[in-house]
C-alpha cells in the first residue's frame, strides 16, 4: 500500500522561481509514488492581516499554479483548507491536548510576535491546527523545509500524547526534508535566498513574469568583474546561482555549461539563460491562464474538497469518540 504524504501551502501572492525549484517541483514529483494531499492553508493565512479580495485571489492563483506545474488531480488531492470543516474542528481538539508553554516556545511565534503589542491568538495556536491538518489524513510523511521542522516535532508529540491519553488512532508522521532542490538565491544579492518579499523586484523571478521582464531581470543580475562562467559558490556566488538555474531548467550539467561558455563573456551567457527561463516557464504560464478563470479549476477544487472531506470526517469521528464528544451513535 502507498504511504500518505501531506503538504500544506500558504496562499501568499506570487510564487517565485526559488519556490518552484526548491519545493513545488519536488512535491509534484512525489505524487507518483505516494497517496498525496496538497492543501491550500487559507485558515493559517489569516493569522496575519489579510485583504479579503487579495486572499481569495491568492488562493485561486496558487491552485492554478500547482496544476500548471504538473499536479495531476487524478493522482493527488488538491483542496482548500477552509472547505474541509474537519480541520478547524480537529484543530480545536488538538489545542486541548497542547500546552501553552510548548506553543510559546515555537520559534515562528517568537519571531512574528516580537515587538508587537497586539498579537492574535491564532498565531500562538497555529501549530495545533497544523497538527490537525496532518493527522486527519493518516499521514506517514510530511515534506517540509528546515523552518517547519520544529512544528512537525510538535505534531508528533501531540499525536503521541493523544494516542496515550485517549485512544491509539493517529499515525505518527515522519519528517521528509526534500533532497535539496537547489537553493535559489536573490539575483540582486546572491548571498540571500530569493524571496518575493524583497523590496527590489529585480531580485526575484516569479512564475508569471513576462518574457521581457524575465530578460531584464536576468540581464541585470549581479555577477562579478571576472567575466569567467565558472561555478564557485564561495568566490562567484552570483554566477554560480545563474548556473544552477540554467542547469535545472535547461536539463544540463554545470560542467557542460562551463565548457560551453569557456572564453565567452557574461552577456552571451545571460542572454541564453533568459531564453532557457522563458521557454521553461511558457508552458506553465499557458496552462495557468487556461485554468485561472475556468470551470475546470472549480471542478478540480470541488472534487478535491469532496475527497478530503470523506477522509478527514472519518478521522474526526474517531477523535470525537476517543474524547467522548457528542452522542454515541449506532
UniProtKB/Swiss-Prot annotation:
Motif ('HIGH' region): 11-19
Domain of life: Bacteria
UniProt catalytic activity: tRNA(Trp) + L-tryptophan + ATP = L-tryptophyl-tRNA(Trp) + AMP + diphosphate + H(+)
Motif 'KMSKS' region: where in chain: 193-197
Entry keyword annotation includes Zinc: no
Record InterPro entries: aa-tRNA-synth_I_CS, aa-tRNA-synth_Ic, Rossmann-like_a/b/a_fold, Trp-tRNA-ligase, Trp-tRNA-ligase_bac-type, Trp-tRNA_synthetase
Localization per Swiss-Prot or TrEMBL: Cytoplasm
Any GO CC annotation of this UniProt entry: cytosol
Binding site for L-tryptophan: 133
Keyword annotations from UniProtKB, A to Z: Aminoacyl-tRNA synthetase, ATP-binding, Cytoplasm, Ligase, Nucleotide-binding, Protein biosynthesis
Residues the record lists as binding ATP: 10-12, 18-19, 145-147, 184, 193-197
Entry keyword Cytoplasm: yes
Gene3D superfamilies: HUPs (3.40.50.620), Tyrosyl-Transfer RNA Synthetase (1.10.240.10)
Biological process annotations from GO: tryptophanyl-tRNA aminoacylation
Single GO term (MF): tryptophan-tRNA ligase activity
Annotated Pfam families: tRNA-synt_1b
EC number: 6.1.1.2
NCBIfam families: trpS (TIGR00233)
Function: Catalyzes the attachment of tryptophan to tRNA(Trp).
Subunit comment: Homodimer.
Protein's UniProt name: Tryptophan--tRNA ligase
Organism: Bacillus subtilis (strain 168)
Gene this chain is encoded by: trpS
Amino acid at each position: 500500500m502507498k504511504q500518505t504524504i501531506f503538504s500544506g501551502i500558504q496562499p501568499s501572492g506570487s510564487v517565485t522561481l526559488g519556490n518552484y525549484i526548491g519545493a513545488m517541483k519536488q512535491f509534484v514529483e512525489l505524487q507518483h509514488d505516494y497517496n498525496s494531499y496538497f492543501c491550500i492553508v487559507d485558515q493559517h493565512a489569516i493569522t496575519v492581516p489579510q485583504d479579503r479580495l487579495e486572499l481569495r485571489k491568492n488562493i485561486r492563483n496558487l491552485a492554478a499554479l500547482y496544476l500548471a506545474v504538473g499536479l495531476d488531480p487524478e493522482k493527488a488531492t488538491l483542496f482548500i483548507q477552509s472547505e474541509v470543516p474537519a480541520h478547524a474542528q480537529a484543530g480545536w481538539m488538538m489545542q486541548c491536548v497542547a500546552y501553552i508553554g510548548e506553543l510559546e516556545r515555537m520559534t515562528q511565534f517568537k519571531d512574528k510576535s516580537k515587538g508587537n503589542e497586539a498579537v492574535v491568538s491564532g498565531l500562538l495556536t497555529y501549530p495545533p491546527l497544523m497538527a490537525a491538518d496532518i493527522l486527519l489524513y493518516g499521514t506517514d510523511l510530511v515534506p517540509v523545509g528546515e523552518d517547519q521542522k520544529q512544528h512537525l516535532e510538535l505534531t508528533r508529540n501531540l499525536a503521541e500524547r493523544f494516542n496515550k491519553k485517549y485512544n491509539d488512532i493517529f499515525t505518527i508522521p515522519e519528517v521528509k526534508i526534500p533532497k535539496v532542490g537547489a537553493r535559489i538565491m536573490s539575483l540582486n544579492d546572491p548571498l540571500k535566498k530569493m524571496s518575493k518579499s524583497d523590496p527590489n523586484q529585480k531580485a526575484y523571478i516569479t512564475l508569471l513574469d513576462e518574457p521581457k521582464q524575465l530578460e531584464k531581470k536576468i540581464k541585470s543580475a549581479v555577477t562579478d568583474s571576472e567575466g569567467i562562467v565558472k561555478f564557485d559558490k564561495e568566490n562567484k556566488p552570483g554566477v554560480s546561482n545563474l548556473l544552477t538555474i540554467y542547469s535545472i531548467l535547461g536539463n544540463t550539467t554545470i560542467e557542460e555549461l562551463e565548457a560551453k561558455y569557456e572564453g565567452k563573456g557574461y552577456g552571451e551567457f545571460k542572454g541564453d539563460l533568459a531564453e532557457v527561463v522563458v521557454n521553461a516557464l511558457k508552458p506553465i504560464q499557458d496552462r495557468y491562464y487556461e485554468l485561472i478563470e475556468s470551470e475546470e479549476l472549480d471542478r478540480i477544487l470541488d472534487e478535491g474538497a469532496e475527497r478530503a472531506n470523506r477522509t478527514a470526517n472519518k478521522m474526526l469521528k474517531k477523535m470525537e469518540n476517543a474524547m467522548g464528544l457528542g452522542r454515541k451513535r449506532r
